Amino acid sequence: MHSEDQKMLEYDTFTEAYVDLIKRVYQRPEHVCSPRGMKIHEYLGVTFKICDARNRLPYVPERNFSIAYFIGESLWYLSGNNSTEWISRYSSFWKNISDDGSTANSAYGSRIFKPHDRIAATVDNTWTQWKYVIDELINDQDSRRVVIHIRSPQDSLLAKKDVPCTLTLQFFLRQDRVHQTVCM
């Protein structure tokens, strides 16, 4: 971002953050580049806070926002499903970016709510990253280790079209409130 913008940005709502950041990146991009032939504008290292986390649905009349798709995608993530068949009822986007036509590599829910293969095989077949978040916050309310890993090393090698842009979700329990930091 430009030097005057190098601070923590604060917004009351998700919509306010979304609209302001879209305007900033299009009107004053820090970088313009073309990964995989797609021209993009970008800022690196943007940090912002949404003060009213309950007001988290984007309301931007100019944008084609489908509440049915939003609900469907949320349920898909929460179910731990990464099959494109189910979510494609709401949008063909997922089948179009799938590397194998049937699996969405970037379906966060599968990575968060399903048992991790390597850990399940060696330690605990019920262990999930979400279970770890809950257990760790209960056992150590001051923990800084409560991290969900979304992107894995295999994504860099195996996935070609569908790679998660989110790297980690980190949770903190402070003053009886859960705070989340997302690294993308």
Model regions and ranges:
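Terminal, non-catalytic protein-protein interaction segments that mediate quaternary/complex assembly
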Residues: M1-M184
